[in-house]
A protein has these predicted regions:
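A secondary-structure boundary/capping signal
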Residues: 15-16, 29, 83
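Conserved hydrophobic "DFG−1" position in protein kinase catalytic cores
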Residues: 18-21, 91-93
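General beta-strand structural signal in soluble alpha/beta enzymes
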Residues: 53-58
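ATP-binding/phosphotransfer module of carbohydrate and carboxylate kinases, centering on a glycine-rich
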Residues: 2-13, 20-26, 43-51, 66-77, ...
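Glycine-rich phosphate-binding loop of actin/hexokinase-like ATP-binding domains
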Residues: 73-124
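Glycine-rich, phosphate-binding/catalytic loops in enzymes
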Residues: 29-32, 97, 193-195
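Active-site-adjacent loop/helix segments that line or gate small-molecule/cofactor pockets in enzymes
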Residues: 59-63
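A charged helix-plus-loop insertion that forms the helical arch/lid used to bind
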Residues: 25-38
Length: 227
């Protein structure tokens, strides 16, 4: 890493899948790294590299990147949803990133839903629970497999319920999807909108802009903009 770090680097921004203390750069519980408990990441890296370091949740970095450099740059109130091994969100209100007191404002996957939570039904766990993977289901759907298409339709219904929950809580102008599952949006979009017909405020759904992020490395761009 020392060969990659050039003398003209002015700052470092890092997004981690964890609740963090953004002001002090403390990482509390990184998903997938059990040993990372209350790691003072900002202090460690600033001592090593001698430049300011900014640490935030990875979904917040995604939202910051999308709102500054991507599809949401024209909107003030945006919720950016990362669909992958889990599901989380970054929230922009009035053009500013909203993190909550402990940077956990977007932990929507942990909200109870049906018999489990939204993460079980709106991430790759949905497909694993049905004996496949998101990648395999996507490839089968591309080939026209009826079973795979039906699976994505079911998934889209759950995403529609997730969007409804976001509308009730935040009433954003736009929702932008990202993550490894977002590229399959074309397979679950219709079912999502079918579910949204149940939302009681039709005008809200009509004016809501829903899309997928297309900017490459948008999370890295967001991390670079952290303050």
């Amino acid at each position: 890493y020392t060969t990659l770090f050039r003398s003209d680097v002015a700052r470092i921004g890092i997004g981690v899948p964890s609740v963090v203390d953004a002001a002090r750069g403390i990482v509390y519980n990184v998903v997938g790294i059990p040993s990372w408990r209350e790691v003072y990441l900002k202090d460690l890296l600033e001592k090593r590299f001698g430049v300011p370091v900014y640490v935030n949740n990875d979904c917040n970095c995604f939202a910051l990147g999308v709102s500054r450099f991507g599809e949401a740059s024209a909107y003030s109130d945006v919720v950016c949803v990362a669909l992958g091994t889990g599901v989380g969100a970054g929230i922009v209100i009035g053009g500013e990133l909203y993190c909550g007191h402990d940077t956990g404002a977007g932990e929507i996957g942990s909200i109870p839903y049906l018999d489990r939570d939204y993460e079980y039904y709106c991430s790759s766990r949905f497909f694993v629970g049905r004996g496949t993977t998101g990648k395999e289901a996507y490839e089968r759907a591309l080939a026209g497999d009826p079973a795979a298409l039906a699976l994505w339709h079911e998934f889209g219904g759950h995403i529609g319920r997730l969007v409804m929950m976001i509308l009730y809580a935040y009433d954003p102008e736009a929702i932008v999807f990202g993550g490894s599952i977002a590229h399959a949006f074309g397979f679950f979009r219709e079912a999502m909108y079918e579910q949204l017909k149940q939302f009681p405020y039709a005008k809200t759904v009509e004016r809501l802009h829903i899309c997928c992020s297309s900017v490459e490395h948008v999370g890295l761009l967001g991390a670079s903009a952290c303050e």
